[in-house]
């Protein structure tokens, strides 16, 4: 792999505030997404991902403000996901400074959204977010990995491996693969899931869910991911971006 491995902090934003506790002593307001994104930029993050977890649509414009303020002081690619339902939503996020836009539930409900966005803005803009988990008990999917929605609370019955393959055909430029089983456990990424997806798609995979220590990151790249994403280990100051990059470098991977 000649391309540099990307290290990406993820910020969950609810009504303009970062949720999932953040502990940085040098920030005046650790709940401010713009300040936090700027801190990660200073730390050497390769990209920033914002996930708008606001339930109500009344706060949609708040996210636009967050993105445009961040774009003024953070000069690395920015992906914004959550609540993106139409090509118009994508357009408004790109106009205010996002480089890429993540789609999830809306694409499951209407897969043509992927091709409509890709045709209009280019594949490189579209990141398909997949919240997948291993099936327990009776298996309904061929791979044993199922797509979920509502933060893992709702089963779709859709095979996650089939879905990423289909999304690539429709024009997705990248897969944000989030393991709902590993998410929050700090016990490492779901390597088997990453391998299964890598076998089926050529587009980049961002591994998400389960990072707890620096040693967790190289195996995800070894399994086939092109980038690694984490939230709480960075927010709580357990690890810095530099820690993760040093570990990846130690294992022979190129980092920026």
Curated annotation (Swiss-Prot):
<dbReference type="InterPro" id="IPR013785">
    <property type="entry name" value="Aldolase_TIM"/>
</dbReference>
<dbReference type="Pfam" id="PF00977">
    <property type="entry name" value="His_biosynth"/>
</dbReference>
<dbReference type="InterPro" id="IPR006062">
    <property type="entry name" value="His_biosynth"/>
</dbReference>
<dbReference type="InterPro" id="IPR050064">
    <property type="entry name" value="IGPS_HisA/HisF"/>
</dbReference>
<dbReference type="GO" id="GO:0016829">
    <property type="term" value="F:lyase activity"/>
</dbReference>
<keyword id="KW-0456">Lyase</keyword>
<comment type="function">
    <text>IGPS catalyzes the conversion of PRFAR and glutamine to IGP, AICAR and glutamate. The HisF subunit catalyzes the cyclization activity that produces IGP and AICAR from PRFAR using the ammonia provided by the HisH subunit.</text>
</comment>
<dbReference type="InterPro" id="IPR011060">
    <property type="entry name" value="RibuloseP-bd_barrel"/>
</dbReference>
<protein>
    <recommendedName>
        <fullName>Imidazole glycerol phosphate synthase subunit HisF</fullName>
        <ecNumber>4.3.2.10</ecNumber>
    </recommendedName>
</protein>
<comment type="similarity">
    <text>Belongs to the HisA/HisF family.</text>
</comment>
<keyword id="KW-0028">Amino-acid biosynthesis</keyword>
<keyword id="KW-0368">Histidine biosynthesis</keyword>
<dbReference type="GO" id="GO:0005737">
    <property type="term" value="C:cytoplasm"/>
</dbReference>
<comment type="pathway">
    <text>Amino-acid biosynthesis; L-histidine biosynthesis; L-histidine from 5-phospho-alpha-D-ribose 1-diphosphate: step 5/9.</text>
</comment>
<feature type="active site">
    <location>
        <position position="131"/>
    </location>
</feature>
<feature type="active site">
    <location>
        <position position="12"/>
    </location>
</feature>
<comment type="subunit">
    <text>Heterodimer of HisH and HisF.</text>
</comment>
<keyword id="KW-0963">Cytoplasm</keyword>
<dbReference type="GO" id="GO:0000107">
    <property type="term" value="F:imidazoleglycerol-phosphate synthase activity"/>
</dbReference>
<dbReference type="InterPro" id="IPR004651">
    <property type="entry name" value="HisF"/>
</dbReference>
<dbReference type="GO" id="GO:0000105">
    <property type="term" value="P:L-histidine biosynthetic process"/>
</dbReference>
């Amino acid at each position: 792999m000649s391309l540099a491995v990307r290290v990406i902090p993820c910020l969950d934003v609810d009504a303009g505030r970062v949720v999932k506790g953040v502990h940085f002593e040098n920030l005046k307001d650790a709940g401010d997404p713009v300040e936090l994104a700027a801190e990660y930029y200073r730390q050497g993050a390769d990209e920033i991902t914002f996930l708008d977890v606001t339930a109500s649509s009344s706060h949609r414009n708040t996210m636009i403000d967050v993105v445009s303020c961040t774009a003024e002081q953070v000069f690395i690619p920015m992906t914004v996901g959550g609540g993106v339902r139409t090509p118009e939503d994508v357009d408004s996020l790109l106009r205010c400074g996002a480089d890429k836009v993540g789609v999830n539930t809306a694409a499951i409900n209407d897969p043509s959204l992927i091709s409509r966005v890709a045709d209009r803005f280019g594949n490189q803009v579209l990141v398909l977010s997949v919240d997948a988990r291993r099936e327990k008990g009776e298996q309904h999917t061929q791979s044993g990995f199922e797509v979920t929605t509502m933060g893992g609370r709702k089963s779709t019955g859709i095979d996650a491996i089939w879905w990423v393959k289909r999304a690539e055909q429709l024009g997705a430029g990248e897969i944000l693969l989030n393991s709902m089983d590993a998410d929050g456990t700090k016990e490492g990424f779901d390597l088997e899931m990453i391998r299964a997806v890598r076998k089926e798609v050529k587009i980049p995979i961002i591994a998400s869910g389960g990072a707890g220590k620096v040693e967790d990151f190289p195996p995800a790249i070894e399994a086939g991911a092109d980038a690694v994403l984490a939230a709480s280990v960075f927010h709580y100051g357990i690890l810095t971006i530099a820690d993760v990059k040093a570990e990846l470098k130690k294992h022979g991977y190129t980092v920026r």
